[in-house]
Amino acid sequence: MNASVRIGARSLLAHRRRLLGTVASIVLGVAFLTGTMVLGDTLRANFDTLFADANAGTGAVVRSAEVLDAPNVPGGVRAPLDDALTAKLRAVPGVSAAEPSVQGAGQLIGADGTPIGGQGPPTLAGNWINDSQLNPYRLAEGRAPAAPGEVVVNRGAARTGGLHLGSTTVLRTPDPVRVTVVGIATFGADADGMGPSTFTALTLADAQAHLTPRGSGQVSTVRLRSDTLSQRQLVERVRPLLPDGVEALTGADATAQSTADVSGRFLGLFTTLLLVFAGIALLVATFTIHNTFAIVTAQRTRENALLRALGASRGQVLGTTLGEALALGALASGLGLLGGFGVAAGLKALFAAIGFTLPTGGTVVHTATIVLPLLTGTVVAVGSALAPALRAARTAPLAALRETAVDGAAEGRGAWLRAGLGALLVFGGLPATVVGATRGPSLTLTVGGALAVLAGTVVLGPVAAALAVRTLGAPLPRLRGVTGALARRNAARNPKRTAATATALMVGVAVVTLFTVFGASVKATLDDSVSRSFAGDLAVTAPATGAGGSGVSPKLAPALSALPEVRAAVGLGRGVAQVDGHGRQLDVADPAALAQVVDLGRIDGSLDALGADGLAVSRAEAAARGWSLGSTVPMRFTDGPAAFTVRALYQGGGVAGDYLISRQAWQPHRVQDADTMVAVALRPGVTLSQGKAAVQRAADAYGSPKAQTRAEYAASSAGAVDMMLSVVYALLALAVLIALLGIANTLTLAVHERTRELGLLRAVGQTRGQLRAMVRWESVLVAAFGTTGGLALGAFLGWALTRAADSAGTGSFALPAGRLAVVLLVGLLAGALAGLRPAARAARLDILRAVAAD
């Protein structure tokens, strides 16, 4: 065996306890990366299997070729088909069965009166397809719907809503439909549903009556099968009979597109998000690993020098250290790979806990999922150890024999170079970030500048560490006497080491702070938007199509207007059209009435003049498109193109979006009527509580949408932000844990390094309790440096991101002092906890052995 390999192996075994923190850091980082990749592989395979099983009997799908991109609607919005096409296709030779399919939004009310779903995943409704081979759903209990008001619901929705055979409830389409559950179905062979979505199946007549606004003779698609033709032959057979604007595709192609629409976008965002957090965890681990090897290498200066004196070359010393890192990285990566399966299960449970149930199935692992984490963990370990290894290899033998633990503060030319490079990055990145956030704004320039500031902060860490720790620890001598003074001095004595240890925590805290500030700013923007633009007293809301629900019935606003407590009630609907090749969301309302409950700011032109072909546009959107009053705007709807004229410009940035048309204009193009909210203004003399009670009683007859005050409406609009922050905090906890392991590991190594010094302190009268307190306070100071630096950096980056993302210039910036104070306190407390084990080890040192230590 090579001498370098033998020496490296013996060194690892001899110092294995010192490297436990490093191993743990790599294990956690690699486990997160592996868990993310395993979960992604598994979900993709589960979605593929789920859809393939459900659609196995479908040979071809006929649908409209006209499709519009729609925000939050996977696959976009397609035009409906004439149901007469179904009979025509049934008559084609070789077609064994042809069944119409109607799809729309429909949200069930559970047994407890609360809506089922509606928190993101779609709530779907459609007709029950009688041909079992063409129906992706399979009856698990009961029977198919045969009479008006009878429905089949997917098993997951029934379980969530406490529904069973014979249950009577309401289906919001969005008009309320009284229904009775006669069947419970699985998606495919045994899935509770199509992922986390819900599905309610009605008779074809009911589905056409409630889900298609243009009459009962329309369907969404026609599904075909053949007992004699292949899928490709079936498509070729029916294609010549299809009218213009209608297409046919094989069942396999339709399944692949459905899988991509439902799972592709979601999984792409899902796995990318998780990989970002895995990257943050590995970045934090990099600082911990580098610091550990820097300390261990410095502590072994005499050992390495002796090897050099005995004839070892620089390359052999370098190879020994890197070999240790390679072995350590490979071992820890292997353990992390195994732990990744547990992380995948934990991530799945985390999302299930917030109501986002993922499809079940066997675990799937691709080769890349094994190789990439192993390589990543090993490369991170070796790369982090490279600089300490090079430093060890460059040490002259005779000089090294006269030194011990050489890893001092950044001094001399190296310190000046570090200071210069760090200053260049910070003072170059700061203006770029500010300009990108305030001029334009430019997200690319902002992110580039922010990364430069982050890199510069890391580089300047050793330069700033001593001053920062002395400043933060200034009260300690007065509060804790000599113990506090020694803790402060110990934390500042090696700025390079302190900075490297604190930087890991700083990165984690900075990201936590960034998301906290950004989330608070989004909530403040929503609150200001409602306060500024919502002039009503109450809002009646339900999740809309594309946001997980079916919206509010358009019949509700007229019903509320008839209440004696109500002065005005105006429904605000949503539509979609293609403008300049891109799908745009349209607000649909009675423009003149809308002005009574929504403040649109200064209006140029006239809302009363919109009519059947008029358009009102926000000023920001009009400026971006080069439009003015009188401009003609070509639009494309699912039923074809239409030209609109800009007849009004308004402020925008509030409850109303960028495009507003009248209900008269939307009538020919509508797909499924729904309002996202009804804004209500009360009559003078009616109290808020009286008005809310009256409005809620009336709304209960329309599927129980929720009546809210302005403050409640603003708070509910921001509810998704709190959910997002909860997930982010849970994911970032791993990075912060790795950073705290780094602090504990560094202090443990420092205790070993300062054994003789600690023994002398005990010999001159320091008690065990004082020694423990000294080490704990040193840990707190390092954590304070990392936490305060992370808070400052994260707050700045949060401000920059908030401004850069606010292209309309109507957003608000908020600095949540309470939450940031909690982050600070948690950081300090975590620092104290990280110091417990090193402090206990220091206190257990035998005085005589410690004093005699070399």
State what each model feature region is.
Residues 6, 18-19, 30-62, 67-68, ...:
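Alpha-helical transmembrane segments
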